[in-house]
Every structure is written in structure tokens, then in C-alpha cells.
Amino acid sequence: DLQTTGADHSATVNPDQQLIMTKHSATVTPENKCVFPFNYRGYRYYDCTRTDSFYRWCSLTGTYSGSWKYCAATDYAKCAFPFVYRGQTYDRCTTDGSLFRISWCSVTPNYDHHGAWKYC
């Protein structure tokens, strides 16, 4: 249950810090970082997700263990350069393979292996 409604979840937020919520309590700590990829309920995530939540969140460990936080702009996955796509190495965003010719990049060094990407 990652939604923050209910009696178990309450905290005040300092706008200069990130709100870190666990399943049972909330703690404000500025140094916690998202871990990518992370495993949650049998799936691997390479970026922040809305799974089981109204807002995008990430795990603070490689395998979700109850430590997580809402994602800020700086938490989202970054392009991994260089990356491999269809056996070719790219050192910048590409429109190759994009149906609508929109620039994209892999968020892992090997798109062919992981299939994880984002728009540039």
C-alpha cells in the first residue's frame, strides 16, 4: 500500500527536503536516493512508477523492502550514453525505431537487453 491516505501516513513537509514514506511511518531525509533498477512485486522498474500509487515513486533499495519516496524532477531515470540499440551504439538521442520520429534514449547501456527507454 503506497498510497498516502489513511491513519498510518502523516508528516509535515519542509519544501527544502524530500518526503520519505515507509509502509508504517514517514521520515524527512534529504540524502535518500532512488535506486534503479528496482524490483517490486515481481517487476523490474528502470524509472519512477505510479504502480500502487497516485503519484510517481521509487524504491530506495534494489529490491523493494518498504523504503521508498515520491520522485522529484531530479530522481527520474537519465539517458545512458553510449547505449546499444539493434546492435548499433548511440552516443546521443535518436529517432531510429520511433514511429512518430520523436527523439528517445535508452536508460540502460543496452536497450536490446533491457528494453528500458525514455523520450529526450
Curated annotation (Swiss-Prot):
Question: What PTM annotation applies here?
Answer: O-glycosylated on Thr. There are two forms of HSP-1 which probably differ in the amount of sialylation of polysaccharide.
What is the tissue localization of expression for this protein? Major component of seminal plasma.
Pfam name, any one: fn2
Q: Which residues are glycosylated?
A: 5, 12, 22, 27
- Residue stretches of each sequence repeat: 1-13, 16-28
Region feature (2 X approximate repeats) = 1-28
- Where does the record place it? Secreted
| Chain ranges of the Fibronectin type-II domain | 29-73, 74-120
Which controlled-vocabulary keywords does the entry list?
Disulfide bond, Fertilization, Glycoprotein, Heparin-binding, Repeat, Secreted
Q: Name one GO cellular component term.
A: cell surface
Gene Ontology BP annotations:
single fertilization; sperm capacitation
- GO molecular function of the protein, one example? heparin binding
The disulfide bridges present are 34-58, 48-71, 79-105, 93-120
Q: InterPro entries, alphabetically?
A: FN_type2_dom, FN_type2_sf, Kringle-like, Seminal_plasma_PDC-109-like, SP_Capacitation_Regulator
User: From which domain of life does this come?
Assistant: Eukaryota
Family that this chain belongs to: Belongs to the seminal plasma protein family.
Function of the molecule: Could enhance the fertilizing capacity of spermatozoa upon interaction with heparin-like glycosaminoglycans present in the female genital tract.
Q: How does it assemble?
A: One glycoform exists as a monomer while the other forms a heterotetramer with HSP-2 and binds heparin.
Q: What is this protein called?
A: Seminal plasma protein HSP-1
Species, as recorded: Equus caballus
